[in-house]
């Protein structure tokens, strides 16, 4: 008889980023004090769950978000590169509306195709590696629960893919807040529900 397995896909907490750049996969970006508090709130919310593994992206902010969750269950944080942030041409630059890289005509070619997208890792590639990460986690924690800590675009792309929606989207409409939890509920290897929560919301 199939058994229920849950994979909780957590977005990392707030990052210390005083210059406001798109940090992407750059090293050295750690959680802010608020981000650390958000990670602790997620750990509290998951404290009574049947967590048997905590797996994180190799980036510092994801590892720091995973640490208190793992500690509550007496587990070590494991690392899976499939959970890493998406690659982006604008990494290391400011990309806010009205300033930064978008004002430079030399980079406009990178914005030509929002459907792939032309400025970064293809959505289909993100979906493929995130699905691989979740499938590994599901098998690892069969009959129990596993936490995977990742990043906004990978988590949102995974959710779109698993729920049969198109992958290209308006980034402003992502339902994936800092330190949010997207819980994937499986009956055996069949996804039966997706539950979104924000345990760190103020």
Curated annotation (Swiss-Prot):
The keyword Cell membrane does not apply. There is a cross-link at residue 136 (Isoglutamyl lysine isopeptide (Lys-Gln) (interchain with Q-Cter in protein Pup)). One of its GO terms (molecular function) is phosphatase activity. Coiled coil: none annotated. The keyword Ubl conjugation applies. InterPro entries: His_Pase_superF_clade-1, His_PPase_superfam, PGM_Phosphatase. It holds the Pfam family His_Phos_1. GO terms for cellular component: cytoplasm; plasma membrane. Keywords: Isopeptide bond, Ubl conjugation. This is Uncharacterized protein Rv0525. It comes from Mycobacterium tuberculosis (strain ATCC 25618 / H37Rv).
């Amino acid at each position: 008889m199939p058994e229920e397995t849950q994979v909780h896909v957590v977005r990392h907490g707030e990052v210390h980023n005083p210059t406001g750049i798109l940090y992407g996969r750059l090293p050295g970006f750690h959680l802010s004090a608020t981000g650390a508090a958000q990670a602790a709130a997620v750990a509290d919310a998951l404290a009574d769950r049947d967590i048997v593994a905590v797996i994180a992206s190799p980036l510092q902010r994801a590892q720091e978000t995973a640490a208190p969750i793992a500690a509550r269950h007496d587990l070590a944080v494991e690392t899976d590169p499939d959970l890493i942030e998406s690659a982006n041409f604008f990494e290391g630059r400011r990309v806010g509306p009205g300033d930064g890289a978008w004002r430079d005509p030399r980079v406009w070619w990178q914005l030509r195709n929002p459907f792939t997208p032309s400025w970064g890792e293809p959505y289909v590639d993100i979906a493929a590696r995130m699905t691989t990460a979740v499938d590994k986690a599901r098998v690892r924690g069969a009959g129990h629960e596993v936490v995977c800590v990742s990043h906004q675009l990978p988590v949102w792309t995974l959710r779109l893919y698993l729920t049969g929606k198109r992958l290209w989207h308006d980034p402003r409409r992502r339902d994936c807040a800092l330190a949010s939890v997207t819980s994937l509920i499986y009956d055996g290897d069949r996804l039966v529900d997706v539950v979104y929560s924000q345990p760190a919301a103020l």
